[in-house]
Amino acid sequence: EIDGWYVDKCIKKVKLPTLNPGKIEIEIEIPFFLRGRTEWCYVLGDFGVNVTGKFVTAVNKAKKLAFGSAVNQTLPFYTGNITYHTGYTETKKAHRTLQISNFGGALARVKADGKDLGVVAISPYCIDLGEMEKGWHDIEITVFGTRFNNFGPVHNNVKNYAYWGPNSWRTYDSPMWTDQYNLRPTGI
């Protein structure tokens, strides 16, 4: 029974019964023919995932994320946005710039003390915070995810692959294929 859609109206959701801990096999029957390819299937829910090489295990989802890739914090296939709440104490009034030089995402939106300062998307990955008064300042950074770890060619074994096209996914009969997951870092 169809129960809504995921990301795009063409990707239908089917409700599963409650799954209990342990080894679970889900069998899917679909039409398959020579010129067709199977598409990805996803198990969606409020749980985390650990990926070790080619092995994937459902686990409890992390309650909070630390700085570092969400891939290693039970969210390897999460491709939505991640908002970080942090802050600092300014010891004297000063003009400040924030640099976010290492984030995995399409861009990052920055707010300081609730004021939207704009986005960071290209080198040198800096944003002007302006004049910051003495005292505590809340900083909010939202990293906008990409769909790579969800829909990308995560079994392509070529590092720094220069071309993304149909054959980027169809690597099963070549040295480009690997059973392990090659995921991109997401978050800060």
Locations of the language-model features?
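Solvent-exposed residues in well-ordered beta-strands and their adjoining turns
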Residues: 17, 29-33, 50, 89-91, ...
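Short, surface-exposed tryptophan/glycine-enriched loops
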Residues: 8-25, 127-136, 147
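Aromatic-lined ligand-binding clefts that engage carbohydrates, nucleic acids, or primary amines
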Residues: 1, 26, 88-90, 94-114, ...
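Active-site-proximal structural scaffolding
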Residues: 7-9, 19, 40, 81, ...
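Extracellular beta-rich ligand/substrate-recognition surface
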Residues: 2-7, 73-83, 117-123
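Glycine/proline-rich low-complexity spacer/linker segments in large multi-domain proteins
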Residues: 31-60, 144-188
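Edge strands and adjacent loops of beta-rich recognition modules
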Residues: 56-87
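Short beta-strands within extracellular/lumenal beta-sheet-rich domains
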Residues: 12-14, 78-90, 124-127
